[in-house]
Structure formats: structure tokens, C-alpha cells
Regions:
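Short, ordered loop/turn segments at secondary-structure junctions
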Residues: 72-74, 142-143, 185, 206, ...
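Phosphate-binding loop of NTP-binding sites
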Residues: 91-240, 244-255, 307-310, 369-370
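Short gly/ser/thr-rich secondary-structure transition/capping motifs
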Residues: 20-30, 93-96, 159-162, 181-188, ...
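N-terminal leader/targeting and accessory segments in enzymes
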Residues: 1-95, 243, 266-274, 298, ...
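ATP-dependent carboxylate-amine ligase
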Residues: 1-18, 39-42, 55, 253-256, ...
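Receiver (REC) domain switch/active-site residues of two-component response regulators
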Residues: 66, 199, 401
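Acidic, Mg2+-coordinating active-site environments of NTP-dependent enzymes
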Residues: 11, 70, 74-80, 174, ...
């Protein structure tokens, strides 16, 4: 729906999907959440993984819904209200959203980034680089949605399908010409990006996560691969050092394919990488020439992220020289290998690492940043993949000198049981302190000034989820308070 234009009618939204007697009914907004319904809105009642929208049709009407599209079978009596039943409504939600928001992805270039780790960093570094190249780039993802510097809060890595198209429409109104979107496996499996005309798809890596949802790595990889089957794609950027990425690349049309990695078969091949405390240098071979890339980022794992962004810029039509220049101007992403370096204090690293592979990578990088001991403070999220908990505990035992197990976002699980799952994979030398602030304070108090403390799992987050309530909490703010720093 264009701002200032006439409202869209229900008939326009459902044309070719279902017939009903309400074609001329004006629709002023749309939502999948009955709590967000406003006067004149259309409510889509869809059965989800945890909640069935059909249970909330009455609440939607009480809040002012003008009509309801409901997945069959409808669970409420229609009486005189406008309830339109549609078989497999979720399959049409993307089309309906596109019609309401006037096909926003037709008017803006969309880059989708998927993978277990690196999505946020790649999207934000890519957006920064594109801005340096004269674009107005926005992001949709974990840290927030919108143009950089003015992000709106986002509760999901990839929003629901209606919100995705709404965000794209907002990006257009903010004069963005490129959107860098994190695309989670959940989003792909649940059709949350249906109808989005992606121009470029990027694959970073695949390692264990979300098996509470996907059950096995085969299903997890299959969900990720859906992004690369979208017909609007002009380029596919794939890390072929990753086993699944290598397999995925073989399914892509050669004219669309841009590969990167240390592999000799990579179109952008890494030859050399040098990592310093706040700086990365990569020598790579592109089109027969050796190119030197520099970026002001910490951590060896960011070599792959920078290479992904460089390759994406090439795939989007920028020269290697322009891509190199743009990456020089990028800055670290909040909560991703974020360093807090205070004279006379232990070096603190805040990172979002919440998978075994990510924790392994970050701890290995932390070891190279200090001559002292490495401490790690972390927990695991509740209501999430339980299988990774002992694995993360094992990683911490192997790679850190001291480990303090604490709360992450316990949600509806008992924190002490989550901690026990983590400790099951450990060597018995760990400490457990479930109060996250106290755990951080304990590490800061006991670490030497030459030591390093990794606070992992929450990164940029500013609240802590206890299921029935959330409380304000920021790892960065806690460290600043304990170090008596000005925010």
C-alpha cells in the first residue's frame, strides 16, 4: 500500500486465490498477530509452530479487524463477520503481502545471507561497504531493521512474511536502494521470505544449530538451500571451503555462481590471511590477479566474512578496486568480536557466539589476543537445541583456562538444568554462577590485567528472556558499569 494512496481492497488482495462477497472492503493494514491489530486491519489466522492464529480470531475482531483470512478449517463461528477460509493460507501470505505493499522488492535490490554463523556480520559489513560506494543500504536482521544508524528493534533474525514485505516497503520510504537481509533456516522453512525477489544469495557456512527444530543436519541444510532456488537470483555467492557449501555450489547454474575460499576451485581464492588485534589483511586471487583486502576487524573467523562480502560486491558488479576501497572504511559490528580494552584491566571480548563452532572459533581467536589466561563466561538459550549444550561445554573446557557457566536466555527452562547440560561436556573445573551480572563481575575480579575475558552468547542484546518476562540486560553495559566507564 503506497502512503497517501487509496486503501487496497480485500478483493485485490485475494484475487485468484479465493472468491468471496467482500471484494470492495477496504484494508488499511495487515498482521499475523492479533495483539497488533488496529482498526481497519486484515488479520491472517495461520497455524504456526507454537501458536495457532485461528484461536485468536475473536480477539482480532475485538481490536478492530475489518476482516479475517483464516486457514481451513476455521475454528470459530462466522456469524455475521467477514471470515474468509483459505486452504493452505500460509502459501499465499507472501503474495498477499506483496499486493498490499505494492511489490516492494521489485523496486529495491535485495541481498539474502544465510548460514549458521556470520549472517549479521556479513550483512552489516556489506551495508557499510555499499554506503561507501554511494548506495543507501539498509539491513534486516538480528540487530535490527532499517538504514544503518537508525535501526528499528527486531525480535527475530528474519521477521514474519508480512513484516518482511512491510520492512522492505519502509526501506524504500527511507530511500534505501539495497537491502542486506539475514535469512534464517526457520524463515526459509516457514515461508517467511515468500514473494521476495532476491537479487543475490550468499551462503557462509553450516554447522550444528537449531536441531531442536530441524532434527538433523540434512534437513537443516535442505532449508538453507531453498534460498538458492529462488528464480529472481542473478548471483549466488557460496563458501566452498564448507562441505555443504561445496555440494550446494554444484547445483547452481555456472553463470550465476561466485565461489570463495582457500580452495583452488574458488573464483575468489584466498592465498594469505594475516590477523592482528584490530585488523585483517587478505591476499586473494581474482580473475588471474592478486588483490590485497584490508578491513579493521578482529578475529580470524572474520577473514571468511570479509571474503564473503568482497565476493558479493564483485557479484553485484563492483570492480575489485572499488570493493577493496569500500572495505577499508568498514567498522566492527556491535556484539561481534567487540573489544573493550581498558588500561590496567583484562581485555574483554563480547561476542554473540552461541553454537559450538562459533564458540570454538572465537576462543581460538581470543587466545591469539593475549599472553595471559583466557576466561569465558557463557550459557545456552532455553527452549533451543539441547544437543549443542555439552558440545559447547567441551569447547570451553578445551580452549579456555577458566570457564564460568551462567544464564543466557533461559526462557521457559530451569536455568540450573541448562547449566547441568553444559557441564555434562566439561572437565569439572568450571564454575557455575547463574546470575549473569555476578558471573561477569566474578571474572573481572579474578582475572589478571594481562588476561582476556570472553563474554559469549548475547552479543548486542539488551534484554534477558526468562519466558514469562524479560529484563533489561546488556553485557556491554555491565562491563562498562563494573569498569566504571562512561557509556
Amino acid at each position: 500500500m503506497n502512503i497517501g494512496s487509496a486503501p487496497v481492497t480485500l478483493g485485490q488482495l485475494t484475487k485468484g486465490i479465493v472468491t468471496h462477497g467482500f471484494d470492495d472492503l477496504p484494508v488499511f493494514g495487515m498482521t499475523l498477530d492479533s495483539r497488533k491489530v488496529r482498526d481497519g486491519d486484515l488479520f491472517l489466522a495461520i497455524s504456526g509452530q507454537a501458536v495457532d492464529g485461528r484461536d485468536f480470531i475473536n480477539q482480532a475482531y475485538e481490536r478492530g479487524a475489518v476482516a479475517v483470512l483464516a486457514e481451513t478449517p476455521v475454528k470459530t463461528e462466522n456469524d455475521s463477520r467477514t471470515v474468509v477460509a483459505i486452504d493452505e493460507l500460509s502459501k499465499y501470505a507472501g503474495l498477499i503481502a506483496n499486493r498490499f505493499y505494492n511489490y516492494p522488492s521489485k523496486h529495491i535490490r535485495v541481498v539474502g545471507v544465510t548460514g549458521t554463523n556470520g549472517k549479521t556480520t556479513c550483512c552489516h559489513i556489506l551495508a557499510q561497504a555499499l554506503n561507501e560506494l554511494g548506495s543507501c543500504a539498509s539491513v534486516i536482521g538480528t540487530i535490527g531493521n532499517g538504514v544503518l544508524g537508525a535501526l528499528r528493534d527486531n525480535s527475530l533474525t528474519t521477521p514474519d512474511v508480512l513484516s518482511v514485505h512491510q520492512e522492505l516497503s519502509k526501506n524504500l520510504s527511507e530511500e534505501a536502494d539495497v537491502v542486506c537481509m539475514e535469512v534464517s533456516s526457520h524463515a526459509l522453512d516457514q515461508n517467511r521470505v515468500d514473494g521476495v525477489l532476491f537479487d543475490v544469495a550468499v551462503f557462509t557456512n553450516l554447522s550444528q544449530d537449531h536441531l531442536d527444530y530441524h532434527h538433523d543436519m540434512t534437513s537443516y541444510g535442505k532449508a538453507k538451500s531453498k534460498l538458492f532456488q529462488i528464480k529472481s537470483l542473478s548471483s549466488c555467492v557460496i563458501n566452498i571451503d564448507d562441505v555443504f557449501g561445496c555440494q550446494l555450489s554444484q547445483l547452481i547454474e555456472p553463470e550465476l555462481l561466485w565461489t570463495y575460499g582457500v580452495s583452488e576451485q574458488a573464483r575468489v581464492r584466498q592465498l594469505l590471511a594475516k590477523v592482528e588485534r584490530n585488523h585483517i589483511r587478505i591476499d586473494c586471487r581474482v580473475n588471474g590477479a592478486v588483490v590485497e583486502i584490508k578491513a579493521p576487524l578482529a578475529g580470524a573467523f572474520n577473514v571468511s566474512n570479509v571474503l564473503a562480502v568482497f565476493t558479493t560486491l564483485m557479484a553485484m558488479g563492483y570492480s575489485s578496486n572499488k570493493a577493496v576501497e569500500s572495505l577499508l572504511a568498514t567498522r566492527p559490528v556491535p556484539g561481534r568480536m567487540e573489544l573493550i580494552d581498558v588500561l590496567g584491566k583484562p581485555l574483554v571480548v563480547i561476542d554473540f557466539a552461541h553454537t559450538p563452532d562459533a564458540l570454538d572459533n572465537v576462543l581460538k581467536n581470543c587466545r591469539g589476543l593475549t599472553q595471559g589466561k583466557v576466561w569465558v563466561v557463557f550459557g545456552c538459550g532455553g527452549d533451543r537445541d539441547k544437543g549443542k549444550r555439552p558440545q559447547m561445554g567441551a569447547v570451553a573446557s578445551q580452549l579456555a583456562d577458566h570457564a564460568i557457566i551462567t544464564n543466557d536466555n533461559p526462557r521457559h527452562e530451569k536455568p540450573e538444568l541448562i547449566a547441568a547440560d553444559i557441564c555434562a561436556g566439561m572437565n569439572g573445573r568450571q564454575q557455575v554462577c547463574l546470575d549473569r551480572k555476578q558471573a561477569i563481575a566474578q571474572a573481572l575480579k579474578n582475572a589478571g590485567k594481562d588476561d582476556l575475558i570472553l563474554i559469549a552468547g548475547k552479543g548486542h542484546e539488551t534484554d534477558q528472556d526468562f519466558g514469562s518476562y524479560k529484563q533489561s540486560f546488556s553485557d556491554r553495559a555491565v562491563v562498562a558499569e563494573l569498569f566504571e566507564l562512561r557509556q
